[in-house]
Regions:
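Glycine-centered hinge/linker elements that transmit conformational signals in sensory
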Residues: 189-192, 227-257
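N-terminal secretory signal peptides
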Residues: 1-13, 24-30
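Extracytoplasmic/periplasmic substrate-binding proteins
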Residues: 55, 62, 112, 215, ...
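N-terminal export leaders
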Residues: 14-23, 169
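Extracytoplasmic "Venus flytrap"/periplasmic binding protein-like
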Residues: 68-137, 170-173, 271-272, 282, ...
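Extracytoplasmic "Venus flytrap"
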Residues: 47-66, 83
Length: 447
């Protein structure tokens, strides 16, 4: 694994607590707990301590593992307080409005930080100092959250890939490269495997808590249409859903029961499946030599892939600014990034060589993440940004398309037109700009 570098190609992360319940399903005693003075309302840490408010690693075990990383690498005393996104947003906004900021450092997903941009310090100078870390152009552009200056420093990342039991390679069609799949090749493989095995052996997480909507948002539609929202009902989108309808006929119908793919993959019910890296990691845990992790397929517009990126931000008028900057510098160093990967399965955002002693599953995923980001035509997509409590309603629109097109066989264009109206109704009430891969605009809506 020494040839693995996290340096995505320069192209033309849903809550982690849900995804990483115990490292396998998704993703030391608490450091300085006694002197933290830090509660879920964001109360101040003690003097000389970085009060770190974050949306990440909320389960107790994850939090404790990350506190151990901070204790080892942060180069400053840190009181780490993990809260849900709603508390995070209200705490930052309320303290900023009151002119009484008690935090020093903020950590959250891009979509959680972007709406708070006006309450965050410009970190352009800090990023210039860290230019040697190898943050990609795409990531640096995202840190500007639609403005002209950066509001956070990339912290860690995750994405979605395809897990392959090597037994399925028996049915890989001639000319199809498992490490460079096209959607056409993926469909042909699924059909051949179904025929060869006598049953469908491809699956997807289409259960009640599955993340299949992220497949349509970040992979299928960007790959076929080049967008996610603006292209939602155009001719290319209809082609994408026609494809999805045909693919569904080759997938196991039990997919509608799968909340994650690692369990059906591990028991052999499914041999090939797409999901979040944190929801695949247990599948090859006991026999990594029998597995591959590969990039998602590419389509007519490129290889759409959804990036889950978390960032570190400085609240305006925050406490212990020098120590907070020191912590950011330390947490962007390769060794601390690798330790975060080991402990909580979030991948580095810096260019770094990964050690050869990573666990088999993590090593497999690391290779797939790298290939996916560096592939020709890689097209970065983000989860919805700035929707707040409405994100669930937007995600439901994509789930409705799957339900009505793939399960109920309703006319595709009719479904897209109806759901586009619903999507625009939600977005018009929010008046937010679009997110990648759609172009930045003052108002996001379906064309």
């Amino acid at each position: 694994m020494k040839d693995i570098y996290f340096q995505p190609k320069h192209a033309a992360m849903s809550r982690r607590s849900l995804l990483l319940a115990g490292l396998g399903t998704a993703m030391s005693a608490p450091f300085l707990a006694s002197c933290a003075g830090f509660d879920t309302s964001g109360a101040t840490a003690g003097e000389g301590t970085v009060g770190f408010l974050s949306t990440q690693f909320t389960p107790v075990e994850e939090k404790q593992r990350y506190e151990a990383v901070l204790k080892k690498f942060a180069k400053a005393p840190v009181a780490y307080n993990s809260v849900d996104p709603g508390v995070f947003s209200s705490t930052v906004s309320t303290q900023a409005s009151a002119g009484n900021v008690k935090t020093s450092l903020l950590g959250g997903l891009h979509g959680e930080l972007a709406p708070l941009a006006e309450s965050l310090e410009d970190v352009d100078n800090l990023l210039r100092d860290l230019s040697g870390r190898g943050f990609t152009k795409e990531m640096l552009e995202l840190t500007k959250v639609g403005g002209s200056t950066s509001r956070y420093v990339p912290w860690m990342q995750a994405t979605y890939v395809v897990a392959v039991n090597k037994k399925a390679l028996e049915w890989l069609p001639s000319g199809v490269d498992v490490n460079d799949l096209t959607y056409e090749g993926y469909l042909a493989w699924a059909k051949a495997a179904k025929q060869g095995a006598g049953r469908p052996v491809f699956g997807m997480p289409a259960g009640p808590k599955g993340l299949h909507h992220r497949f349509y948002q970040g992979f299928l539609l960007p790959s076929f249409t080049g967008g996610q929202i603006t292209t939602f009902r155009n001719e290319d989108a209809a082609t994408a859903w026609t494809y999805m309808q045909e693919l569904w006929s080759a997938l196991t119908p039990a997919s509608t029961n799968f909340d994650n793919m690692q369990e059906p993959l591990a028991r052999g019910e499914v041999l090939v499946g797409w999901d979040h890296v944190a929801r695949l990691v247990n599948a090859p845990a006991n026999n990594p030599d029998e597995w591959l992790m590969v990039p998602a397929p590419r389509g007519p517009k490129g290889r759409g892939y959804m990036l889950i990126i978390a960032g570190l931000a400085l609240p305006k008028n925050g406490q212990e600014r020098d120590l907070a900057e020191k912590a950011i510098r330390a947490l962007s160093e390769p060794l601390s990034q690798i330790e975060t990967l080991r402990s909580n399965a979030f991948f580095p955002v810096v260019q770094t060589e990964l050690p050869s002693d990573l666990t088999g599953a993590i090593a497999l995923e690391a290779a797939a993440v790298r290939r996916q980001q560096r592939s020709e035509g890689a097209l970065l997509a983000l989860p919805p940004v700035g929707l707040g409590a409405k994100e669930g309603e937007v995600s439901q629109v994509f789930k409705n398309c799957f339900q009505q097109i793939c399960l109920e066989n309703r006319p595709i264009q009719q479904v897209l037109d109806t759901q586009a109206t619903q999507l625009n109704t939600i977005l018009q009430g929010l008046n937010v700009p679009c997110w990648a891969p759609d172009p930045i605009s003052t108002k996001c809506e379906v064309a």
